[in-house]
Amino acid sequence: MRYSKLFLCAGLTLATLPCWGRAYTFDSTMLDTNSGESIDVSLFNQGLQLPGNYFVNVFVNGRKVDSGNIDFRLEKHNGKELLWPCLSSLQLTKYGIDIDKYPDLIKSGTEQCVDLLAIPHSDVQFYFNQQKLSLIVPPQALLPRFDGIMPMQLWDDGIPALFMNYNTNMQTRKFREGGKSLDSYYAQLQPGLNIGAWRFRSSTSWWKQQGWQRSYIYAERGLNTIKSRLTLGETYSDSSIFDSIPIKGIKIASDESMVPYYQWNFAPVVRGIARTQARVEVLRDGYTVSNELVPSGPFELANLPLGGGSGELKVIIHESDGTKQVFTVPYDTPAVALRKGYFEYSMMGGEYRPANDLTQTSYVGALGMKYGLPRNLTLYGGLQGSQNYHAAALGIGAMLGDFGAISTDVTQADSQKNKQKKESGQRWRVRYNKYLQSGTSLNIASEEYATEGFNKLADTLNTYCKPNTRNDCRFDYAKPKNKVQFNLSQSIPGSGTLNFSGYRKNYWRDSRSTTSFSVGYNHFFRNGMSLTLNLSKTQNINKYGEKTSELLSNIWLSFPLSRWLGNNSINSNYQMTSDSHGNTTHEVGVYGEAFDRQLYWDVRERFNEKGRKYTSNALNLNYRGTYGEISGNYSYDQTQSQLGIGVNGNMVITQYGITAGQKTGDTIALVQAPDISGASVGYWPGMKTDFRGYTNYGYLTPYRENKVEINPVTLPNDAEITNNIVSVIPTKGAVVLAKFNARIGGRLFLHLKRSDNKPVPFGSIVTIEGQSSSSGIVGDNSGVYLTGLPKKSKILVKWGRDKNQSCSSNVVLPEKTDISGAYRLSTTCILNN
């Protein structure tokens, strides 16, 4: 009680004491004692900077959404003058803000700068020293975040472009006996043309022995509002319900890539706790399916692009302190499964397009639909037909919880093959998946042809041959009776993985069948070694009852040599292969990478034990460069030698010229960093900007934000980019421009003096004419450090709001630099009156 009274008295005494605070301001005369004039420091006294264009990181509700240059202007809010960002409605949409809910955002009839405070309970903070712009909005003002799918308004159809992926190969073999040689030449060309939303694609191959062959040619475009895709030309029918067939016609179908994955397919939820701000990597079968940055604390990744199937996800949490957390997440999905309420469809019609030109022209059509029901059920079905073929299918998929996942469907087909009677039959199909916590994964698929009268569409149409081609138009009347396949995988903690797989197919009326099975084991050791064991057997019985079988075993061992050769990417391996005929082959090799992973090399020697023993040697090289990829191989043994060379890459023609690079996928970013040559893009071996500062960056994911990155370490000494990461959101098949703001020029320590012989005030903003962002700030000795200066330039200096509080000067870089590689110069700044 005594202490309570003492604390109470002390508290009352302190509460009666006044508290003084003081606002500190800049004295302009102290800042510029040599200039003799009053400097406008009112903005600095308010904790502000001069208005202008600044590079900032943008955060919405604490989450970083963008980085870039933003124009800041002086505006009054609540009676205070503030530096206020000028943001467009398109930028807010990109940041994930639902602008349609707030029509008052657009002020004065223009979309140049929206009224950010039109969103109730919102707040804007600009932290100049941190280069951070923070926007706080209520949760209901945000657009839903669906699996990385960006708002439709931000989808970029790209620029007009003509491009081509190419792959060429030449092999020549010389035989020691007789001196004969055998040459083989191959080329594959995949040209494409983009005009607006339309995509024109083709694929053509050429063999020396067979000549030219076209695989496909078609035009397609996205129908964004209905999340579908229209295709005209040579394509394939949907394969989820009926067997896919090649057609030439029209197809319209749901485009799953436009829709958040979790809305249409089942996927597991990955949960964990990050100790620091971390990068969470999720792998499926060794391939990365998700790579997300998360803040410290609990996290949840619910929308993973797995594409069906079952198995185990490996989750690696890369903490910012360099440590890792690793755990696994098992999952099951049925063969056909949609989320509740999601509808998917596919319609097509046209001519059947077989691989040979001996089959008669037949018109076909197909319709397929799938719908997600409550209680983890999916109903699906479809129709397929031609002049002599009609089929209908109906199926259902279900999640069974602890019992796994299953889907089953039945197809009724009525058909008539050429010069045969009409037939009718059914096919049942069942798929089952189950994963156990013990690390066991079971996948069983069974197709049972319940009646002999069932035929597939392609099997029926292939019997109708063109006139006078009967002898060349061969087809097999054999009908599959049933087919069963299974895959079983068992993880052994600390000891690797064991895999089993089997397959059997039987036919009606005769004894023909195909049976195969395989057993495999693999283990990766902590020291980098790896061991793989495989045993497989295949047995075929033809219609005459003749049996052939093949037994094959393989041992593969790899171990790193870095322990003895230093920190080099060099490995050695041993492989033994044995077959049922008694042939045993041993192979040893050394392989690795060099020149910043651009060159892959592989040297091998092989020895055969059986009969006439022989050895063979082989050398393989592969180089990935700025303008493409080149490979070569050479091998020889006692009977022959072989030499080969291959070249592949990509070429894009746009309004910016011709850009050659490594082979890309269908969706491409044209990287533009003017005049910056040799900069690495995306950390992919050999992918660098060409002599103009351009390159092709492929394999982008459509309708999602893709980050294209230039490695700043690889920039030339005289180059600078304001931001080394550019975000693009392409539509499927687009060629989008990834533009980097680049400056090429010298680094300069510049001492400024005004034309009235007074020093330039401390804190003055210096910009280079023709550039929107500030380049430097004048120090206390009228000095400023500038980068990216051309040989000749004009600088603009401003230290106040009035015109007479600015000056300009023409700068010509000296001939020589100092020891640090920077120029040093003094110049007079001409006052603007």
Curated annotation (Swiss-Prot):
Membrane topology: Multi-pass membrane protein
Principal localisation: membrane
SS bond list: C807-C829
SUPFAM superfamilies registered for this protein in UniProt: FimD N-terminal domain-like
Pfam families reported in the protein's UniProt record: PapC_C, PapC_N, Usher
Keywords of the record: Cell outer membrane, Disulfide bond, Membrane, Plasmid, Signal, Transmembrane, Transmembrane beta strand, Transport
Any one GO MF annotation of this record: fimbrial usher porin activity
Signal peptide segment: 1-25
Location of this chain's protein in the cell: Cell outer membrane
UniProt GO cellular component terms: cell outer membrane
InterPro entries: Fimb_usher, Fimbrial_membr_usher_CS, FimD_plug_dom, PapC-like_C, PapC-like_C_sf, PapC_N, PapC_N_sf
GO terms of biological process kind: pilus assembly
Family, similarity comment: Belongs to the fimbrial export usher family.
UniProt cross-references to PANTHER family, sorted A to Z: F1 CAPSULE-ANCHORING PROTEIN, OUTER MEMBRANE USHER PROTEIN
Function: A probable role in capsular biogenesis. It is likely that the caf1A molecule binds F1 antigen subunits during the extracellular secretion process.
Record protein name field: F1 capsule-anchoring protein
Lineage of source species: Bacteria, Pseudomonadati, Pseudomonadota, Gammaproteobacteria, Enterobacterales
Gene name as annotated: caf1A
